[in-house]
Amino acid sequence: MDFQHRPGGKTGSGGVASSSESNRDRRERLRQLALETIDINKDPYFMKNHLGSYECKLCLTLHNNEGSYLAHTQGKKHQTNLARRAAKEAKEAPAQPAPEQVKVEVKKFVKIGRPGYKVTKQRDTEMGQQSLLFQIDYPEIAEGIMPRHRFMSAYEQRIEPPDRRWQYLLMAAEPYETIAFKVPSREIDKAEGKFFFLQFHFKMEKPPAPPSLPAGPPGVKRPPPPLMNGLPPRPPLPDALPPPPPGGLPLPPMPPTGPAPSGPPGPPQMPPPAPGVHPPAPVVHPPTSGVHPPAPGVHPPAPVVHPPTSGVHPPAPGVHPPTPGVHPPAPGVHPPAPGVHPPAPGVHPPTPGVHPPAPGVHPPAPGVHPPAPGVHPPPSAGVHPQAPGVHPPAPAVHPQAPGVHPPAPGIHPQAPGVHPQPPPGVHPAAPGVHPQPPGVHPSNPGVHPAPMPPMLRPPLPSDGPGNMPPPPPGN
Protein backbone atom coordinates (compact mmCIF):
# COMPACT_ATOMS: atom_id res chain seq x y z
CA MET A 1 0.00 0.00 0.00
CA ASP A 2 1.31 3.32 -0.86
CA PHE A 3 1.19 5.53 2.15
CA GLN A 4 3.17 8.31 0.56
CA HIS A 5 0.88 9.25 -2.22
CA ARG A 6 -2.54 9.07 -0.64
CA PRO A 7 -4.90 11.92 -1.21
CA GLY A 8 -4.97 14.53 1.55
CA GLY A 9 -1.54 13.63 2.73
CA LYS A 10 1.47 15.88 2.91
CA THR A 11 4.91 14.82 1.97
CA GLY A 12 7.03 14.29 5.07
CA SER A 13 4.12 14.16 7.53
CA GLY A 14 2.51 11.29 9.31
CA GLY A 15 -0.70 9.68 8.45
CA VAL A 16 -4.05 11.24 9.22
CA ALA A 17 -5.12 10.53 12.83
CA SER A 18 -8.08 8.32 13.21
CA SER A 19 -11.17 9.26 15.26
CA SER A 20 -10.19 7.03 18.19
CA GLU A 21 -6.86 8.68 18.46
CA SER A 22 -8.49 12.10 18.36
CA ASN A 23 -10.86 11.14 21.25
CA ARG A 24 -8.04 9.79 23.38
CA ASP A 25 -6.09 12.96 22.93
CA ARG A 26 -9.11 15.06 23.87
CA ARG A 27 -9.76 13.12 27.06
CA GLU A 28 -6.17 13.49 28.16
CA ARG A 29 -6.31 17.21 27.67
CA LEU A 30 -9.55 17.46 29.69
CA ARG A 31 -8.06 15.38 32.50
CA GLN A 32 -5.08 17.66 32.80
CA LEU A 33 -7.33 20.69 32.89
CA ALA A 34 -9.56 19.11 35.52
CA LEU A 35 -6.67 18.11 37.75
CA GLU A 36 -5.46 21.70 37.71
CA THR A 37 -8.76 22.97 39.16
CA ILE A 38 -10.17 19.95 41.03
CA ASP A 39 -8.43 17.83 43.65
CA ILE A 40 -9.73 14.35 42.96
CA ASN A 41 -8.51 13.06 46.30
CA LYS A 42 -10.95 15.37 48.13
CA ASP A 43 -14.01 14.26 46.16
CA PRO A 44 -16.33 12.43 48.61
CA TYR A 45 -17.78 10.24 45.83
CA PHE A 46 -14.51 9.09 44.28
CA MET A 47 -13.39 5.54 45.11
CA LYS A 48 -10.79 3.19 43.71
CA ASN A 49 -11.72 -0.48 43.94
CA HIS A 50 -9.55 -3.59 44.23
CA LEU A 51 -9.43 -4.10 40.46
CA GLY A 52 -7.67 -0.80 39.81
CA SER A 53 -10.69 0.91 38.26
CA TYR A 54 -12.54 3.93 39.65
CA GLU A 55 -16.13 4.17 40.88
CA CYS A 56 -18.55 7.00 41.54
CA LYS A 57 -20.42 6.28 44.78
CA LEU A 58 -23.09 8.83 43.98
CA CYS A 59 -23.98 7.54 40.53
CA LEU A 60 -22.66 3.97 40.99
CA THR A 61 -20.71 4.11 37.74
CA LEU A 62 -17.42 2.33 36.89
CA HIS A 63 -14.50 4.15 35.21
CA ASN A 64 -11.25 2.74 33.89
CA ASN A 65 -9.12 5.81 34.49
CA GLU A 66 -9.15 9.15 36.28
CA GLY A 67 -10.00 11.06 33.11
CA SER A 68 -13.14 9.07 32.64
CA TYR A 69 -14.25 9.85 36.20
CA LEU A 70 -13.49 13.54 35.79
CA ALA A 71 -15.50 13.63 32.57
CA HIS A 72 -18.34 11.95 34.46
CA THR A 73 -18.34 14.57 37.19
CA GLN A 74 -18.89 17.25 34.55
CA GLY A 75 -21.73 15.36 32.91
CA LYS A 76 -25.47 15.78 33.29
CA LYS A 77 -26.09 12.56 35.24
CA HIS A 78 -23.63 13.37 38.01
CA GLN A 79 -24.84 16.98 38.33
CA THR A 80 -28.48 15.86 38.55
CA ASN A 81 -27.67 13.38 41.30
CA LEU A 82 -25.81 16.09 43.23
CA ALA A 83 -28.87 18.39 43.13
CA ARG A 84 -31.18 15.55 44.23
CA ARG A 85 -28.89 14.64 47.17
CA ALA A 86 -28.71 18.24 48.33
CA ALA A 87 -32.52 18.61 48.26
CA LYS A 88 -32.98 15.38 50.21
CA GLU A 89 -30.52 16.41 52.94
CA ALA A 90 -32.11 19.82 53.26
CA LYS A 91 -35.54 18.23 53.72
CA GLU A 92 -34.44 15.69 56.29
CA ALA A 93 -32.34 18.08 58.33
CA PRO A 94 -34.27 19.64 61.25
CA ALA A 95 -35.07 23.27 61.02
CA GLN A 96 -32.40 24.97 63.08
CA PRO A 97 -32.64 28.65 63.87
CA ALA A 98 -29.90 30.70 62.43
CA PRO A 99 -27.41 31.85 65.05
CA GLU A 100 -28.06 35.39 66.03
CA GLN A 101 -25.21 37.66 65.28
CA VAL A 102 -24.01 39.68 68.23
CA LYS A 103 -24.77 43.24 67.46
CA VAL A 104 -22.42 45.72 69.00
CA GLU A 105 -24.20 48.97 69.56
CA VAL A 106 -22.18 51.86 68.38
CA LYS A 107 -21.92 54.48 71.06
CA LYS A 108 -23.42 57.68 69.88
CA PHE A 109 -22.27 60.82 71.57
CA VAL A 110 -21.39 64.31 70.55
CA LYS A 111 -17.70 65.00 70.84
CA ILE A 112 -16.95 68.16 72.76
CA GLY A 113 -13.30 68.54 71.81
CA ARG A 114 -9.87 67.47 72.94
CA PRO A 115 -9.01 67.28 76.64
CA GLY A 116 -6.24 69.23 78.26
CA TYR A 117 -3.02 67.43 78.98
CA LYS A 118 0.38 67.82 80.56
CA VAL A 119 3.41 65.60 79.94
CA THR A 120 6.35 65.51 82.35
CA LYS A 121 9.67 63.76 81.82
CA GLN A 122 10.93 62.00 84.94
CA ARG A 123 13.93 59.98 86.05
CA ASP A 124 14.09 57.56 88.98
CA THR A 125 16.74 58.72 91.44
CA GLU A 126 17.62 55.19 92.58
CA MET A 127 17.37 53.11 89.41
CA GLY A 128 17.94 55.83 86.83
CA GLN A 129 14.88 54.74 84.82
CA GLN A 130 13.34 57.27 82.46
CA SER A 131 9.59 57.73 82.62
CA LEU A 132 6.81 59.95 81.34
CA LEU A 133 3.98 61.34 83.46
CA PHE A 134 0.77 62.03 81.52
CA GLN A 135 -1.88 64.18 83.18
CA ILE A 136 -5.12 64.35 81.20
CA ASP A 137 -7.99 66.63 82.22
CA TYR A 138 -11.48 65.19 81.79
CA PRO A 139 -13.69 67.60 83.75
CA GLU A 140 -16.87 66.72 81.83
CA ILE A 141 -16.40 62.97 81.43
CA ALA A 142 -19.60 60.97 80.99
CA GLU A 143 -21.14 59.28 84.03
CA GLY A 144 -19.87 55.76 84.61
CA ILE A 145 -17.03 56.10 82.06
CA MET A 146 -13.43 55.37 82.98
CA PRO A 147 -10.59 56.66 80.80
CA ARG A 148 -8.94 53.95 78.70
CA HIS A 149 -5.56 53.74 77.03
CA ARG A 150 -3.63 51.51 74.66
CA PHE A 151 -0.29 51.43 72.86
CA MET A 152 -0.41 51.46 69.07
CA SER A 153 2.47 50.69 66.73
CA ALA A 154 3.38 52.98 63.88
CA TYR A 155 2.04 50.46 61.34
CA GLU A 156 -1.48 50.47 62.79
CA GLN A 157 -2.15 54.16 62.43
CA ARG A 158 -3.12 55.90 59.18
CA ILE A 159 -2.33 59.49 60.07
CA GLU A 160 1.41 59.58 59.54
CA PRO A 161 3.78 57.50 57.41
CA PRO A 162 4.85 54.44 59.40
CA ASP A 163 8.16 54.82 61.22
CA ARG A 164 9.42 51.96 63.31
CA ARG A 165 11.25 54.33 65.66
CA TRP A 166 8.01 55.62 67.18
CA GLN A 167 4.90 54.28 68.85
CA TYR A 168 1.68 55.96 69.93
CA LEU A 169 -0.11 56.10 73.30
CA LEU A 170 -3.85 56.56 72.84
CA MET A 171 -6.15 57.97 75.56
CA ALA A 172 -9.92 57.82 75.15
CA ALA A 173 -12.86 58.91 77.31
CA GLU A 174 -16.31 59.93 76.12
CA PRO A 175 -17.39 62.54 75.20
CA TYR A 176 -13.87 63.80 74.50
CA GLU A 177 -11.97 63.01 71.35
CA THR A 178 -9.34 60.30 71.40
CA ILE A 179 -5.86 61.75 71.59
CA ALA A 180 -2.49 60.08 70.93
CA PHE A 181 1.02 60.83 72.12
CA LYS A 182 4.01 59.96 69.94
CA VAL A 183 6.65 58.36 72.14
CA PRO A 184 9.88 56.47 71.38
CA SER A 185 9.36 52.87 70.40
CA ARG A 186 10.98 51.37 73.49
CA GLU A 187 9.78 48.54 75.66
CA ILE A 188 7.44 49.66 78.44
CA ASP A 189 8.11 48.46 81.98
CA LYS A 190 4.66 47.33 83.13
CA ALA A 191 5.79 45.84 86.45
CA GLU A 192 3.73 46.51 89.53
CA GLY A 193 4.54 49.89 90.98
CA LYS A 194 6.03 51.11 87.69
CA PHE A 195 3.00 51.74 85.56
CA PHE A 196 -0.10 52.94 87.41
CA PHE A 197 -1.03 55.46 90.04
CA LEU A 198 -3.53 55.13 92.86
CA GLN A 199 -4.99 58.02 94.80
CA PHE A 200 -7.07 57.29 97.86
CA HIS A 201 -8.39 59.05 100.95
CA PHE A 202 -8.39 57.87 104.54
CA LYS A 203 -11.70 57.70 106.36
CA MET A 204 -12.27 60.06 109.26
CA GLU A 205 -11.19 58.36 112.46
CA LYS A 206 -13.35 60.55 114.70
CA PRO A 207 -16.74 61.84 113.59
CA PRO A 208 -17.26 65.58 113.78
CA ALA A 209 -18.12 66.68 117.32
CA PRO A 210 -21.85 67.35 117.77
CA PRO A 211 -22.80 70.93 118.60
CA SER A 212 -22.71 71.55 122.33
CA LEU A 213 -26.18 71.84 123.83
CA PRO A 214 -26.91 74.77 126.16
CA ALA A 215 -27.27 73.86 129.80
CA GLY A 216 -30.96 73.65 130.71
CA PRO A 217 -32.63 74.48 134.00
CA PRO A 218 -31.85 72.26 136.98
CA GLY A 219 -33.80 69.04 137.09
CA VAL A 220 -33.98 68.65 133.31
CA LYS A 221 -32.02 65.73 131.91
CA ARG A 222 -29.89 66.30 128.85
CA PRO A 223 -30.31 63.91 125.91
CA PRO A 224 -27.93 60.93 125.84
CA PRO A 225 -24.77 61.20 123.74
CA PRO A 226 -24.93 59.88 120.18
CA LEU A 227 -24.24 56.21 119.61
CA MET A 228 -20.78 55.16 118.41
CA ASN A 229 -21.09 52.54 115.65
CA GLY A 230 -24.53 51.60 116.89
CA LEU A 231 -23.34 50.86 120.47
CA PRO A 232 -24.24 52.88 123.60
CA PRO A 233 -21.44 54.60 125.52
CA ARG A 234 -19.77 52.61 128.28
CA PRO A 235 -20.60 53.61 131.88
CA PRO A 236 -17.88 55.45 133.80
CA LEU A 237 -15.61 53.28 135.88
CA PRO A 238 -15.29 53.88 139.65
CA ASP A 239 -12.32 55.91 140.75
CA ALA A 240 -11.07 53.65 143.54
CA LEU A 241 -11.38 50.29 141.84
CA PRO A 242 -8.41 48.06 142.80
CA PRO A 243 -6.51 46.33 140.01
CA PRO A 244 -7.38 42.67 139.40
CA PRO A 245 -5.14 40.18 141.23
CA PRO A 246 -2.72 38.12 139.15
CA GLY A 247 -3.39 34.51 138.29
CA GLY A 248 -7.15 34.88 137.91
CA LEU A 249 -7.79 35.03 141.73
CA PRO A 250 -11.07 36.55 142.90
CA LEU A 251 -11.09 40.14 144.06
CA PRO A 252 -10.71 40.69 147.84
CA PRO A 253 -13.63 42.30 149.69
CA MET A 254 -13.81 46.06 149.61
CA PRO A 255 -12.61 47.84 152.79
CA PRO A 256 -15.22 49.55 154.99
CA THR A 257 -16.12 53.03 153.88
CA GLY A 258 -17.03 54.36 157.32
CA PRO A 259 -14.63 56.30 159.54
CA ALA A 260 -12.03 54.18 161.27
CA PRO A 261 -12.48 53.96 165.07
CA SER A 262 -9.99 55.68 167.18
CA GLY A 263 -7.39 53.58 168.90
CA PRO A 264 -3.70 53.24 169.54
CA PRO A 265 -1.61 52.89 166.43
CA GLY A 266 -0.34 49.43 165.72
CA PRO A 267 2.05 47.72 163.38
CA PRO A 268 1.36 47.72 159.64
CA GLN A 269 -1.62 45.69 158.57
CA MET A 270 -1.20 42.21 157.24
CA PRO A 271 -2.65 41.33 153.83
CA PRO A 272 -6.20 39.94 153.91
CA PRO A 273 -6.53 36.17 153.97
CA ALA A 274 -7.53 34.15 150.97
CA PRO A 275 -11.26 33.44 150.54
CA GLY A 276 -12.55 30.65 152.73
CA VAL A 277 -9.67 30.81 155.25
CA HIS A 278 -10.52 31.51 158.92
CA PRO A 279 -8.49 33.95 160.98
CA PRO A 280 -6.22 32.51 163.65
CA ALA A 281 -8.00 31.90 166.91
CA PRO A 282 -6.46 33.08 170.17
CA VAL A 283 -5.64 29.90 172.03
CA VAL A 284 -6.21 30.46 175.75
CA HIS A 285 -4.05 28.43 178.12
CA PRO A 286 -4.15 29.01 181.88
CA PRO A 287 -0.83 29.92 183.38
CA THR A 288 0.70 27.31 185.58
CA SER A 289 2.60 27.74 188.75
CA GLY A 290 5.25 25.24 187.95
CA VAL A 291 7.56 24.52 185.12
CA HIS A 292 6.92 21.30 183.30
CA PRO A 293 8.95 19.87 180.46
CA PRO A 294 7.33 20.30 177.04
CA ALA A 295 5.51 17.44 175.47
CA PRO A 296 7.51 15.36 173.02
CA GLY A 297 7.38 16.78 169.48
CA VAL A 298 6.15 20.21 170.61
CA HIS A 299 8.19 23.16 169.36
CA PRO A 300 8.32 26.43 171.25
CA PRO A 301 6.49 29.30 169.55
CA ALA A 302 8.02 32.45 168.19
CA PRO A 303 8.32 35.27 170.73
CA VAL A 304 7.03 37.81 168.22
CA VAL A 305 3.45 38.75 169.09
CA HIS A 306 1.33 40.29 166.38
CA PRO A 307 -1.36 42.39 168.05
CA PRO A 308 -4.58 43.16 166.25
CA THR A 309 -4.35 45.70 163.46
CA SER A 310 -4.87 49.34 164.18
CA GLY A 311 -8.45 50.40 164.37
CA VAL A 312 -9.82 46.89 164.86
CA HIS A 313 -12.00 46.34 167.94
CA PRO A 314 -12.75 42.99 169.52
CA PRO A 315 -16.20 41.58 169.08
CA ALA A 316 -18.85 43.64 170.80
CA PRO A 317 -21.37 42.11 173.23
CA GLY A 318 -23.96 40.05 171.47
CA VAL A 319 -21.89 39.41 168.38
CA HIS A 320 -22.99 36.28 166.58
CA PRO A 321 -20.79 33.70 164.94
CA PRO A 322 -19.71 34.15 161.31
CA THR A 323 -22.16 34.31 158.45
CA PRO A 324 -23.80 31.10 157.22
CA GLY A 325 -22.01 29.09 154.60
CA VAL A 326 -18.56 29.28 156.22
CA HIS A 327 -17.59 26.01 157.91
CA PRO A 328 -14.54 25.59 160.13
CA PRO A 329 -11.94 23.15 158.94
CA ALA A 330 -12.14 19.54 159.99
CA PRO A 331 -9.95 18.20 162.80
CA GLY A 332 -6.41 17.40 161.80
CA VAL A 333 -5.92 20.39 159.50
CA HIS A 334 -2.29 21.41 159.19
CA PRO A 335 -1.06 24.52 161.01
CA PRO A 336 -0.57 27.82 159.17
CA ALA A 337 1.94 28.12 156.35
CA PRO A 338 5.51 29.27 157.05
CA GLY A 339 5.73 32.97 157.67
CA VAL A 340 2.56 33.14 159.78
CA HIS A 341 3.34 33.57 163.48
CA PRO A 342 1.09 31.84 166.02
CA PRO A 343 -0.20 33.82 168.99
CA ALA A 344 2.19 34.22 171.84
CA PRO A 345 1.73 32.14 174.97
CA GLY A 346 -0.30 33.73 177.66
CA VAL A 347 -2.12 36.18 175.43
CA HIS A 348 -5.77 36.25 176.41
CA PRO A 349 -8.63 37.76 174.46
CA PRO A 350 -9.49 41.17 175.89
CA THR A 351 -12.82 41.83 177.49
CA PRO A 352 -15.60 43.38 175.41
CA GLY A 353 -15.25 47.08 174.96
CA VAL A 354 -11.58 47.19 175.95
CA HIS A 355 -8.96 47.95 173.34
CA PRO A 356 -6.25 45.36 172.93
CA PRO A 357 -3.10 46.16 174.85
CA ALA A 358 0.27 46.58 173.25
CA PRO A 359 2.37 43.51 172.64
CA GLY A 360 4.14 42.10 175.61
CA VAL A 361 1.87 43.57 178.34
CA HIS A 362 0.74 40.26 179.82
CA PRO A 363 3.32 38.83 182.20
CA PRO A 364 4.35 35.31 181.44
CA ALA A 365 3.67 32.48 183.78
CA PRO A 366 6.13 32.07 186.66
CA GLY A 367 8.98 29.92 185.69
CA VAL A 368 8.34 30.17 181.98
CA HIS A 369 11.26 31.47 179.97
CA PRO A 370 10.53 32.60 176.42
CA PRO A 371 12.98 31.55 173.76
CA ALA A 372 15.55 33.87 172.34
CA PRO A 373 14.15 36.58 170.08
CA GLY A 374 14.39 36.10 166.34
CA VAL A 375 14.24 32.30 166.52
CA HIS A 376 11.31 30.91 164.60
CA PRO A 377 11.27 27.15 164.80
CA PRO A 378 9.17 25.61 162.00
CA PRO A 379 5.89 24.19 163.24
CA SER A 380 5.46 20.49 162.77
CA ALA A 381 2.55 19.12 160.80
CA GLY A 382 -0.57 18.62 162.86
CA VAL A 383 0.94 19.92 166.16
CA HIS A 384 0.07 23.30 167.67
CA PRO A 385 2.99 25.14 169.20
CA GLN A 386 2.84 25.44 172.99
CA ALA A 387 4.74 27.46 175.49
CA PRO A 388 7.83 25.78 176.93
CA GLY A 389 6.98 23.95 180.02
CA VAL A 390 3.25 24.19 179.52
CA HIS A 391 1.27 21.02 179.12
CA PRO A 392 -1.40 21.19 176.45
CA PRO A 393 -4.70 21.21 178.34
CA ALA A 394 -7.49 18.83 177.60
CA PRO A 395 -9.72 19.99 174.76
CA ALA A 396 -12.38 22.50 175.80
CA VAL A 397 -11.38 22.25 179.55
CA HIS A 398 -10.00 25.33 181.27
CA PRO A 399 -9.69 25.09 185.06
CA GLN A 400 -10.65 28.13 187.02
CA ALA A 401 -9.84 29.20 190.49
CA PRO A 402 -12.67 29.12 193.04
CA GLY A 403 -14.31 32.41 193.70
CA VAL A 404 -13.94 33.78 190.23
CA HIS A 405 -16.91 35.87 189.28
CA PRO A 406 -18.93 34.97 186.19
CA PRO A 407 -18.88 37.32 183.22
CA ALA A 408 -21.05 40.39 183.15
CA PRO A 409 -24.64 39.93 182.00
CA GLY A 410 -25.16 40.31 178.26
CA ILE A 411 -21.70 39.13 177.40
CA HIS A 412 -21.51 35.80 175.62
CA PRO A 413 -18.15 34.21 176.30
CA GLN A 414 -16.69 32.17 173.55
CA ALA A 415 -16.64 28.43 173.91
CA PRO A 416 -13.27 26.78 174.31
CA GLY A 417 -11.63 26.27 170.95
CA VAL A 418 -14.07 28.59 169.16
CA HIS A 419 -12.37 31.33 167.20
CA PRO A 420 -13.76 34.81 167.84
CA GLN A 421 -14.81 36.62 164.72
CA PRO A 422 -14.12 40.31 164.11
CA PRO A 423 -17.02 42.71 163.53
CA PRO A 424 -18.38 42.99 160.00
CA GLY A 425 -16.21 44.88 157.52
CA VAL A 426 -12.94 44.24 159.41
CA HIS A 427 -10.46 41.89 157.80
CA PRO A 428 -8.68 39.35 160.01
CA ALA A 429 -4.99 39.63 160.66
CA ALA A 430 -2.78 37.08 158.98
CA PRO A 431 -3.93 34.32 156.62
CA GLY A 432 -3.81 30.84 157.99
CA VAL A 433 -6.02 27.92 158.85
CA HIS A 434 -6.28 26.74 162.46
CA PRO A 435 -7.96 23.48 163.36
CA GLN A 436 -11.21 23.52 165.27
CA PRO A 437 -12.14 21.04 167.94
CA PRO A 438 -14.55 18.37 166.75
CA GLY A 439 -18.19 19.04 167.29
CA VAL A 440 -18.04 22.82 167.25
CA HIS A 441 -19.62 24.50 164.26
CA PRO A 442 -19.67 28.26 164.75
CA SER A 443 -20.95 28.80 161.23
CA ASN A 444 -24.47 27.49 161.85
CA PRO A 445 -26.80 30.45 161.31
CA GLY A 446 -28.90 31.52 164.24
CA VAL A 447 -27.06 29.37 166.81
CA HIS A 448 -25.40 31.21 169.70
CA PRO A 449 -22.67 29.52 171.70
CA ALA A 450 -23.87 28.47 175.11
CA PRO A 451 -22.44 30.44 178.03
CA MET A 452 -19.61 28.72 179.86
CA PRO A 453 -20.18 27.64 183.46
CA PRO A 454 -18.68 29.97 186.02
CA MET A 455 -15.95 27.50 186.86
CA LEU A 456 -14.78 27.27 183.24
CA ARG A 457 -14.51 30.99 182.46
CA PRO A 458 -11.15 32.00 180.99
CA PRO A 459 -8.96 33.97 183.37
CA LEU A 460 -8.95 37.71 182.98
CA PRO A 461 -5.80 39.75 182.63
CA SER A 462 -6.64 41.53 185.88
CA ASP A 463 -6.49 38.32 187.85
CA GLY A 464 -2.71 38.18 187.52
CA PRO A 465 -0.52 35.16 187.49
CA GLY A 466 -0.46 34.90 191.25
CA ASN A 467 -4.16 34.30 191.57
CA MET A 468 -4.17 31.30 189.31
CA PRO A 469 -4.71 28.01 191.13
CA PRO A 470 -2.62 25.08 190.11
CA PRO A 471 -4.12 22.83 187.45
CA PRO A 472 -5.97 19.79 188.68
CA PRO A 473 -4.01 16.59 188.70
CA GLY A 474 -4.20 14.64 185.47
CA ASN A 475 -6.29 11.54 185.29
Curated annotation (Swiss-Prot):
GO terms for cellular component: nucleus; U2 snRNP; U2-type precatalytic spliceosome
SMART domains reported for this sequence: CactinC_cactus (SM01050), ZnF_U1 (SM00451)
Positions bearing N6-acetyllysine: K10
PTM annotation (N-acetylmethionine): residues: M1
Sequence segments annotated as region (Disordered): 1-27, 208-475
Residue(s) carrying Phosphoserine: S153
Tissues and organs where the protein is expressed, per its UniProt entry: Found in all tissues examined.
ZnF (Matrin-type) ranges: 54-84
A Gene Ontology molecular function term of the record: zinc ion binding
Keywords: Acetylation, Metal-binding, mRNA processing, mRNA splicing, Nucleus, Phosphoprotein, Repeat, Spliceosome, Zinc, Zinc-finger
Subcellular location: Nucleus
Gene Ontology BP annotations: mRNA splicing, via spliceosome; RNA splicing, via transesterification reactions; U2-type prespliceosome assembly
Pfam families from the UniProt entry: SF3A2 (PF16835), zf-met (PF12874)
Main location: nucleus
Ranges of biased composition (kind: Pro residues): 208-285, 293-306, 314-380, 448-475
Highest taxon of the lineage: Eukaryota
Quaternary organization: Component of the 17S U2 SnRNP complex, a ribonucleoprotein complex that contains small nuclear RNA (snRNA) U2 and a number of specific proteins. Part of the SF3A subcomplex of the 17S U2 SnRNP complex which is composed of three subunits; SF3A3/SAP61, SF3A2/SAP62 and SF3A1/SAP114. SF3A associates with the splicing factor SF3B and a 12S RNA unit to form the mature 17S U2 small nuclear ribonucleoprotein complex (17S U2 snRNP). Identified in the spliceosome 'E' complex, a precursor of the spliceosome 'A' complex. Identified in the spliceosome 'A' and 'B' complexes.
Family (UniProt): Belongs to the SF3A2 family.
Main function: Component of the 17S U2 SnRNP complex of the spliceosome, a large ribonucleoprotein complex that removes introns from transcribed pre-mRNAs. The 17S U2 SnRNP complex (1) directly participates in early spliceosome assembly and (2) mediates recognition of the intron branch site during pre-mRNA splicing by promoting the selection of the pre-mRNA branch-site adenosine, the nucleophile for the first step of splicing.
Entry protein name: Splicing factor 3A subunit 2
Organism of derivation: Mus musculus (Mouse)
